[in-house]
Amino acid sequence: MRKLIFSLAAPLLLSAVAVADDAAPPVAPGAIPSGYVWYSGGSVAVGIGYTWGRGTLYNSKDQKQYPFKLSGVSIADVGGAGINAEGEVYNLTSPADLSGNYSAVTAGVTIIEGGSVAYLKNEKGVVIKLHSQTGGLRFNLSANGMHITLK
């Protein structure tokens, strides 16, 4: 866990500055998704947060489903929440490209129920536009790093 936090923290802060400077979504208007994801999990935080979950990638190219797991850290985050999310995946040339480290800057409030949209991008150029529904109590204006691994 400690190794994950340290390995994601430095690039996370640097990417947070880059993402904050580029307010436009990293997907061209009218782009067609190359896949879709669904996942459920949770998040807890007291300054530094931890997120976990399991999900499924639907690859539009081969019309198959691939299970994955995710874990991640956030900075400037407080609270806890259950998360259900779905999203569109862009720039996916093969299912293996989903695996990797993703970064994003997010802001949100969950008081009993909430939701948000975030763009996550990995080192292979894969972008996930994630729509999440949350339940719990959580306040965040945070830099996030997430690691996704195909099972």
Question: What residues fall within each predicted segment?
Answer:
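Positively charged n-region of N-terminal signal peptides that target proteins for export
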Residues: 1-4
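Bacterial N-terminal signal peptides
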Residues: 7-15
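N-terminal Sec signal peptide cleavage junction
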Residues: 17-19
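Small-residue-enriched, tightly packed secondary-structure blocks
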Residues: 21-151
